[in-house]
């Protein structure tokens, strides 16, 4: 009592404490970073290696495997996957959450160094690594276009200057430049001219390499001067290479220009990039795993004026895609929802109290509690994101509850004629324990969330802590500021009922009287209520099993990603045409604002597209509806498919897939994997629960298999190395020399001129110079026949892997899709040599599904323990927790009604309901126990009186929580996909709980009281009088 009096009788100190909390919160708010969601990115490092011209199988066995064995020894690696394609290997390392990305990078570099001696010779550079997840959508895409500059020159400027500058910005993890390649001098050989002159391809290569050298020449000095020796030992342009003498034929010089076309071109001509309908160079910027997306984008935008100043006038630099506007719009929507919730909650209080002064008290308590929370969020390193702001929106109904309970009890004493300060002290003392019980038991709900591991635990931690801090501050405010304001602002009055006979007061009296009448009937028919209670428990179990489930609500971020997959034997020219066709289809859609794309590189039959949709206010359809519409349009394109998916703020795993969810097949036998993957993919494609089924296993590429006759080769004086060198020189875009420039290094690339390699007959024109100097045609010692070969080889760990990706059709949940896949795998009878498991987001969903019930049970158990300690009773916590089944039924029925699957957001709503609905029972039980102890009432009389006395605060707190969550249900615009499931769950649970617990709680109270008396009689011993 003295504790409460300290704040009631010292108003200045109390006001200053509240002001200090508010000021700290305002300062914290201004310093908090902004993000779409809490930081949940796994630390990911990508290792890249290249060996131009090497087949995917060669890259997998000679490059990927040695690196994997070395990298696999690093501590904290959660998953390691690799993909090897023509001349390229990429290994993705995903680390545990607690692994520091910089420390992991040092270990990766050490592992690369350890594997260096096992890697094949001829690699143009050592393997490199980047601290970025290649499967993440870029946070920003910049495009460079020009009417006068070539694509190679644009690419050179972008990679040499722009990418380097952008990479230095805080938060940037990787700047991937696409659309072309670095400039190079390309030597296109004429096989017939070489044969006529008797010049081998190796001779050409060696001549070029010998003519372009960069070696130190030293210096000459005398007693006075010193001269640095410099020679013209370097050739830098095509014009300088053309007159190069490569051979003498009967004393006549054979120059390079006589047997080849030499041009200033690019290293890899099989690359193309576009923005809308124009050729472009793309700078795809990804953030570091731990970086804040908004701060990183702001840093890039701040750098743009400097970048534009250094760009020549002939180049146009534009932002093709920016993730930040939709994130900011989403947060603005949440902030508006928060403001509406606060207004609605205060309106509810005013309607019940019908007094401006009385309403002002909780109207002050709410902002003080919410604003003060920002300070704690800043100290915890949190951000302003959708989940933390949603926590504050929901907290609006919670933080006002404590103030309402205290205010309502003080007002009751004032209405009885007690003096204000005395009423404030007496009223606070009476409900102080109740308020503490309500708040501590509510915070206890979130303790299991704080201990939850993995991605869900990281994702929900900020929500739980933010809400717990708001409740804690609210508890302090309700026991200090609220009674002080009541004591000094409210006035006592003589007992009268007139105010209750007007407007809302009259309705409340009528409701209370009707409730009293119905409660009497219920207390006389307790068995029927017991049956209803047990029915709600059973209905909970059935609804939870039956309701569709998913991991996280599908968001409309305004950005789509598209993966193009064409026939495996397609040429680059045809693939470029497919890219243009698909971009036109997308560009013509009225909901699309911008589209960029690229193709080429090591995977000729694939391409990527990034689509920016118009803002939500300018289009009627959701992102998924637009995808459904575009899926129909692009299905008419022959020889290729475009797989579209909406970019999400959460994406798990490092696999680059053409759909949102993945199912991975593993086997130690590559043959078994290649046999069963098509069967499984075909069966999954037929499932109505899946859409856009595709696979990264591409083992049907066109190959020309050359078979050497080794005996003939030996007789002709030719070895296998010379024959393989011939093929590499002719068709491998072989980088044979380096040109050193001040800003970068460029390559001299040699191959047969594309004019002479249009079909397989080009092999007939190839020849090898044997040991006797004679030109021996390739057809003399080799035969060739067409065959199929893989375009890529994939590993997970050290096992061969194939990932089947899929999207969800409209109206299908992830749980329905995973159940259908598991059922199909069982029906197919897949052998044990092929193992299947979900990966990425689908894998996390499976893990979350297994822990959801455990989490709910743990929350209930924690609340029981806290209540048991507070009440020093095993029984009363059970009475309070009996409110939960009705809330669960209401929440699940509401989700079914709105066709919303049970997601991680809905789980948060269930956890919140555990904390909300028990408040009604706490208020009933507290007053009933007090009435039994001090008033000498029977349990039936005590619980009946408690229900009637607490009817008004129960209605106030429930309606405050309901109206606080209602804006989440009704909200639209950006980010509404996250807010609505939470609001639906809470509103549905509150409505059902309010209808049932006003009757079931008294019945359960009496049941346990009778049970207690029965056990106490059994355990009591007769007293013997002496």
Curated annotation (Swiss-Prot):
Cellular location(s): Cell inner membrane
Family: Belongs to the resistance-nodulation-cell division (RND) (TC 2.A.6) family. MdtC subfamily.
Any one GO molecular function term: xenobiotic transmembrane transporter activity
UniProt topology in membrane: Multi-pass membrane protein
A GO term from the CC aspect: plasma membrane
Swiss-Prot/TrEMBL keywords: Cell inner membrane, Cell membrane, Membrane, Transmembrane, Transmembrane helix, Transport
Source organism of the structure: Salmonella dublin (strain CT_02021853)
Cited HAMAP family: MdtC
Residue ranges of the TM segments: 15-35, 333-353, 360-380, 387-407, 431-451, 463-483, 528-548, 853-873, 897-917, 953-973, 984-1004
Protein name: Multidrug resistance protein MdtC
Quaternary structure note: Part of a tripartite efflux system composed of MdtA, MdtB and MdtC. MdtC forms a heteromultimer with MdtB.
Superkingdom of the organism of origin: Bacteria
InterPro entries assigned: AcrB_DN_DC_subdom, Acrflvin-R, Multidrug-R_MdtC
């Amino acid at each position: 009592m003295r504790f409460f009096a300290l704040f009631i009788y010292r108003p200045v100190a109390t006001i200053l404490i509240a002001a200090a909390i508010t000021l700290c919160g305002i300062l914290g708010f201004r310093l908090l970073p902004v993000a779409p969601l809490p930081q949940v990115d796994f630390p990911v490092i990508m290792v890249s290696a290249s060996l131009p011209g090497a087949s995917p199988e060669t890259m997998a066995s000679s490059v990927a495997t040695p690196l994997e064995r070395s990298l696999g020894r690093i501590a904290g690696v959660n998953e390691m996957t690799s993909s090897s394609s023509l001349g390229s290997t990429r290994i993705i390392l995903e680390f545990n959450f607690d692994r520091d990305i910089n420390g992991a990078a040092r270990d990766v570099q050490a592992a690369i160094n350890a594997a260096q001696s096992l890697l094949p010779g001829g690699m143009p550079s050592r393997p490199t690594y980047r601290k970025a997840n290649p499967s993440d959508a870029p946070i920003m895409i910049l495009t460079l276009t020009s009417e006068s500059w070539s694509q190679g020159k644009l690419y050179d400027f972008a990679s040499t200057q722009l990418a380097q500058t952008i990479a230095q910005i805080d938060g940037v993890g990787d700047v991937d430049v696409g659309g072309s390649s670095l400039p190079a001098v390309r030597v296109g050989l004429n096989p017939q001219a070489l044969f006529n002159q008797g010049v081998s391809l190796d001779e050409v290569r060696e001549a070029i390499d010998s003519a372009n050298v960069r070696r130190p020449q030293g210096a000459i000095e005398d007693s006075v001067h010193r001269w640095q020796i410099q020679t013209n030992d370097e050739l830098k342009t095509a014009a300088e290479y053309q007159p190069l003498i490569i051979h003498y034929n009967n004393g006549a010089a054979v120059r390079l220009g006589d047997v080849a076309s030499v041009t200033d071109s690019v290293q890899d001509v099989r690359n193309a990039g576009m923005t809308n309908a124009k050729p472009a160079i793309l700078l795809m910027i990804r953030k570091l795993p731990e970086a804040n997306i908004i701060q990183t984008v702001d840093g890039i935008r701040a750098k743009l004026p400097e970048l534009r100043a250094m760009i020549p006038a002939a180049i146009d630099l534009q932002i093709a895609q920016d993730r930040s506007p939709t994130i900011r719009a989403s947060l603005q929507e949440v902030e508006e929802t928060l403001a509406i919730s606060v207004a609605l909650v205060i309106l509810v209080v005013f309607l019940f109290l019908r007094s401006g002064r009385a309403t002002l008290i909780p109207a002050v308590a709410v902002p003080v509690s919410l604003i003060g929370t920002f300070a704690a969020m800043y100290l915890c390193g949190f951000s302003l994101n959708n989940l933390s702001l949603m926590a504050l929106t929901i907290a609006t109904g919670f933080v006002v509850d404590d103030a309402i309970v205290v205010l309502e009890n003080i007002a009751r004493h004032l209405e009885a004629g007690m003096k204000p300060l005395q009423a404030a002290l007496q009223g606070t003392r009476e409900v102080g324990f109740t308020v503490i019980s309500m708040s501590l038991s509510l915070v206890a709900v979130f303790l299991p969330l704080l201990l939850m591991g993995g991605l869900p635990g990281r994702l929900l931690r900020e929500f739980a802590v933010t809400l717990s801090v708001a409740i804690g501050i609210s508890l302090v405010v309700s026991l200090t500021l609220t009674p002080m304001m009541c004591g000094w602002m409210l006035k006592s009055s003589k007992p009268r009922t007139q105010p209750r006979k007007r407007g809302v007061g009259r309705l409340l009296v009528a409701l209370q009287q009707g409730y009293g009448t119905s409660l009497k009937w219920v207390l006389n028919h307790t068995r029927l209520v017991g049956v209803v209670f047990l029915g709600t428990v059973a209905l909970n179990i059935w609804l939870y099993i039956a309701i569709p489930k998913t991991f996280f609500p599908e968001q409309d971020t305004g950005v789509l990603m598209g993966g193009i997959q064409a026939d495996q034997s397609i040429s680059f020219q045809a693939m470029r045409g497919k890219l243009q066709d698909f971009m036109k289809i997308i560009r013509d859609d009225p909901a699309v604002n911008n589209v960029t794309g690229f193709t080429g590189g090591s995977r000729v039959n694939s391409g990527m597209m990034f689509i920016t949709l118009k803002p939500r206010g300018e289009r009627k359809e959701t992102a998924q509806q637009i995808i459904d519409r575009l899926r129909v349009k692009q299905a008419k394109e022959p020889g290729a498919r475009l797989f579209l998916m909406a970019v999400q703020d959460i994406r798990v795993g490092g696999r680059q897939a053409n759909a949102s969810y993945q199912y991975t097949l593993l086997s130690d036998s590559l043959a078994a994997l290649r046999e069963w993957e098509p069967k499984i993919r075909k069966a999954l494609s037929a499932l109505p629960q899946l859409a856009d089924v595709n696979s990264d296993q591409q083992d049907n590429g066109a190959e020309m298999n050359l078979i050497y006759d080794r005996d003939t080769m030996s007789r002709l004086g030719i070895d296998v190395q010379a024959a393989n060198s011939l093929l590499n020189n002719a068709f491998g875009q072989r980088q044979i020399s380096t040109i050193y420039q001040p800003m970068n290094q460029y390559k001299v690339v040699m191959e047969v001129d594309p004019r002479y390699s249009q079909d397989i007959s080009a092999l007939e024109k190839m020849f090898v110079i044997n040991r006797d100097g004679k030109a021996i045609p390739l057809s003399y010692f080799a035969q060739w026949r067409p065959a199929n070969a893989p375009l890529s080889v994939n590993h997970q760990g050290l096992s061969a892997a194939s990932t089947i990706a899929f999207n969800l059709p409209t109206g299908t949940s992830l749980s329905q899709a995973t159940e259908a896949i598991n059922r199909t795998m069982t029906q197919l009878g897949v052998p044990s040599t092929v193992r299947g498991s979900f990966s990425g987001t689908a894998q996390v969903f499976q893990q979350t599904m297994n822990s959801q019930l455990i989490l709910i049970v743990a929350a209930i158990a924690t609340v029981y323990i806290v209540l048991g300690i507070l009440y020093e009773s095993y029984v009363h916590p059970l009475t309070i927790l009996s409110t939960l089944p009705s809330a669960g039924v209401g929440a699940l029925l509401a989700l079914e009604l709105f066709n919303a699957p049970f997601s991680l957001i809905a789980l948060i709503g269930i956890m919140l309901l555990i904390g909300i609905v028990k408040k009604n029972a706490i208020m009933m039980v507290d007053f009933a126990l007090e009435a039994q102890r001090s008033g000498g009432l029977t349990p039936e009389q005590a619980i009946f009186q408690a229900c009637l006395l607490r009817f008004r605060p129960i209605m106030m707190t429930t309606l405050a929580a309901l109206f606080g969550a209602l804006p989440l249900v009704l909200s639209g615009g950006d980010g509404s996909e996250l807010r609505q499931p939470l609001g639906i769950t809470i509103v549905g649970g509150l409505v059902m709980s309010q209808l049932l617990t006003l009757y079931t709680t008294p019945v359960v109270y009496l049941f346990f009281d009778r049970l207690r008396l029965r056990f106490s009689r059994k355990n009591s011993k007769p007293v013997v009088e002496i």
